[in-house]
């Protein structure tokens, strides 16, 4: 019975939290399985601008991809929709992977998660030229 009470209290706390207003920047980190028999890791910096009903902005940073090892620059346009404590997000753009052919690859993902104010935690799935991406993202508002 005690476990159920703690679980109910945790769920009530998460649902009662309200997302924080848009901050100046957002620092994100993600890890994903890429069906091209690789893993993709990113650290990005983004800026979301408030528009009626949603937020839109760029997200650019550093990417590391395994098998074979390659570094690059992900450059995406992000659309973010806050729904209370939850969020839905989509992004699309180009990834520049310098030691792979082709160097410029189309990228698009969508996902969702919990917006806990300064921290957002979520999952995402999508496409990076020649394969699917399935992963998780954590973001910090700065």
Task: Give the ranges of each region predicted by the language model.
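Cleavable N-terminal export/targeting peptides
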Residues: 1-26
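Short glycine/proline- and aromatic-enriched beta-strand/turn motifs that initiate or cap beta-hairpins
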Residues: 20-72
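Membrane-embedded beta-strand positions of outer-membrane beta-barrel proteins
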Residues: 27-31, 58-60, 75, 88-92, ...
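Outer-membrane beta-barrel "beta-signal"
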Residues: 28, 112-117, 131-142
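Short glycine-rich beta-strand segments
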Residues: 30-34, 61-65, 80-82, 91-99, ...
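Short polar/acidic secondary-structure junctions
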Residues: 34, 48-50, 82, 127-130
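Residues that define the transmembrane beta-barrel architecture of outer-membrane proteins
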Residues: 37-43, 54, 69-75, 86, ...
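Outer-membrane beta-barrel proteins
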Residues: 45-53, 78-85, 116-118, 140-142
């Amino acid at each position: 019975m005690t476990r159920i009470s703690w679980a109910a209290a945790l769920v009530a706390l998460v649902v009662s939290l309200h997302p924080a207003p848009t901050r100046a920047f957002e620092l994100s980190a993600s890890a994903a399985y890429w069906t091209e028999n690789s893993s993709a890791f990113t650290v990005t910096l983004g800026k979301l601008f408030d528009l009626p009903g949603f937020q839109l902005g760029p997200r650019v940073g550093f990417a590391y991809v395994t098998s074979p090892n390659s570094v690059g620059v992900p450059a995406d346009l992000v659309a973010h929709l806050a729904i209370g404590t939850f969020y839905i997000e989509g992004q699309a753009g180009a990834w520049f992977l310098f030691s792979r052919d082709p160097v410029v690859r189309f990228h698009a993902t969508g996902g969702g998660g919990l917006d806990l104010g300064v921290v957002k935690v979520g999952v995402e799935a999508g496409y990076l030229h020649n394969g699917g991406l399935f992963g998780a993202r954590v973001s910090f508002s700065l």
